[in-house]
Amino acid sequence: YYKPRKTIFGTLKPVPEEITKDFLEKNGKLVGYITGNSAFASMGLTTQITSSILIGTNRYRNPLTRGDYVISFLQQRNPITEENIPLLRILDALKFIKEIPASSPDSIVVQLGNIICALSKAEQKRLVELAENYTSYVRALLGAIMEQNNLDTESLKNSLNGTTNYKLPISEQALPNKKNWNIL
């Protein structure tokens, strides 16, 4: 049950967490997490606020509409835990790098590089482990960002096919070592 708050600007809409509470938790156990533009805005990657909510969950679900919001689901192969959620959001941002509104892929790479550097060594190691369940271009992009920041990238490099090229709209200025990772 949600009681809307009234302000001088009118009635406030509920926050995405309130609208999607039943998709995020079941019987006190985490079963999903908010990702997509809502999460990317909270990470500082975009300033756009959207009426669509993307939820990462371990099982497939069809999109649905709730009030003014369109809720869609992203199937997540990794376990969803409190500790993993911020790391999964970083990987999701890399996955959707071309689709994040009001931001250039170059600025996103720089911001994600800063976020990854601020993680502890254990979190960085866990990020690499979680990346193994993502597509190869996400692993290549993560590897290039981590290598640029002098972080360990050996397992990411080994997980990639050395002959595959990735066409991503990222400049040499943002990622000078992109050719090492076959990013064109």
Feature locations, PLM:
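Short beta-edge/loop segments at beta->alpha junctions of small alpha/beta modules
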Residues: 1-25
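Secondary-structure transition/turn motif
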Residues: 4-5, 75-78
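Short gly/ser-rich loop at a beta-strand->alpha-helix junction or flexible surface loop bordering the NTP-binding
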Residues: 5, 27-66
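Alpha-helix boundary/capping detector
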Residues: 8-9, 65-67, 116
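Alpha-helix C-capping/helix-to-loop hinge sites
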Residues: 23-27, 97-100
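Structural motif
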Residues: 28-34, 77-85
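A short, charged helix-loop
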Residues: 65-75
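Hydrophobic alpha-helical interaction segments
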Residues: 80-184
